[in-house]
């Protein structure tokens, strides 16, 4: 079974002009990468005023380096989409995957409509990797990941195991790893996450719903510093956030 994993970087959330799209075609059984590309979209890149509104516009030098090193290509939107469609057809891709696919679907639909091009999402069904990781964690098929998160304080504000690409990347690559937030780099970690889900019993081309992750059993040690009369009193405590009907209640143990 061949699948494609992709990611996009955009100017904003509403008028989501895409300036970076990356994708990987991979065989599920062998894990061999059959094709991969990263395209910088010239309609946005060459519009300096527009590109500078992007949240990650400070990565411009990184993109310049990628293009100089021929790791990314500056192309127009139509060329990028045509190439994705060619690879979907050439490799008989059976499923398209993205992390938080609702957003990436919105991006592809918006840009295809804006530029009046074909839409590669018309050529295979799309599935959400976030749904896969939710299923893996809540069905207790990823206990090693859960233990890693609890050990390293990768816990959400609501006290649940974190379930995002950055935390999964740290699980695979170490705590020093940080998500690059460029399309191909993020696609590489997201394809690794997806293959891990398959290895641990989840089925390709299946729609798993995104759901709340399990609550962490660990209580994180924190410090409360009280300053009075030029003196500091430091209390060390553990806390666990509990949801109550009237809002959040913080449980302190000193």
Positions of the model-derived regions?
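Acidic, low-complexity, intrinsically disordered interaction modules
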Residues: 213-234, 238
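A short, charged, amphipathic alpha-helix used as a generic interaction element across diverse proteins
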Residues: 236-254
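Substrate-recognition/cap helix-loop segment adjacent to the acidic, metal-dependent catalytic center
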Residues: 103-127
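Ser/Thr-centric signal marking residues that sit
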Residues: 8-11, 129, 133
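Conserved non-catalytic scaffold segment of RNase H-like nuclease domains
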Residues: 2-111
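Short, polar/flexible loop-turn hinges at active-site or ligand-entry regions and domain interfaces
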Residues: 67-73, 115-121, 175-179
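Active-site-proximal helix-loop-helix substrate-binding element of RNase H-like nuclease domains
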Residues: 43-68, 130-187
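Acidic, Mg2+-coordinating catalytic module of metal-dependent nucleases/exonucleases
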Residues: 92-102, 106-107, 111-112, 149-217
């Amino acid at each position: 079974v061949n699948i494609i994993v992709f990611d996009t970087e955009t100017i904003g959330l509403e008028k989501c002009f895409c300036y970076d799209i990356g994708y990987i075609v991979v065989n599920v059984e062998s894990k061999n990468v059959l094709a991969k590309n990263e395209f910088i979209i010239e309609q946005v890149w060459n519009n300096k005023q527009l590109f500078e509104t992007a949240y990650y516009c400070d990565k411009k030098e990184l993109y310049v380096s990628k293009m100089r090193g021929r790791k990314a290509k500056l192309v127009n939107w139509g060329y990028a989409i045509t190439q994705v469609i060619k690879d979907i057809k050439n490799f008989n891709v059976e499923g398209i995957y993205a992390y938080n696919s609702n957003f990436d679907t919105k991006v592809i639909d918006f840009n295809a409509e804006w530029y009046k091009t074909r839409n590669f999402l018309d050529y295979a069904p799309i599935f959400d990797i976030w749904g896969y990781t939710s299923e893996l964690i809540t069905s207790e098929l990823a206990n090693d990941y859960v233990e890693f998160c609890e050990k390293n304080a990768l816990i959400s504000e609501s006290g649940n195991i974190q379930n995002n690409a950055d935390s999964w990347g740290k699980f695979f690559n170490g705590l020093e790893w940080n998500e690059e937030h460029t399309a191909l780099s993020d696609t590489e970690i997201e394809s690794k996450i997806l293959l891990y889900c398959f290895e641990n019993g989840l089925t390709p081309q299946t729609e798993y719903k995104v759901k709340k992750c399990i609550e962490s059993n660990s209580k994180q040690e924190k410090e409360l510093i009280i300053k009075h009369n030029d003196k500091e009193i430091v209390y060390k405590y553990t806390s666990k956030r509990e949801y109550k009907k009237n809002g959040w209640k913080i449980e302190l143990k000193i």
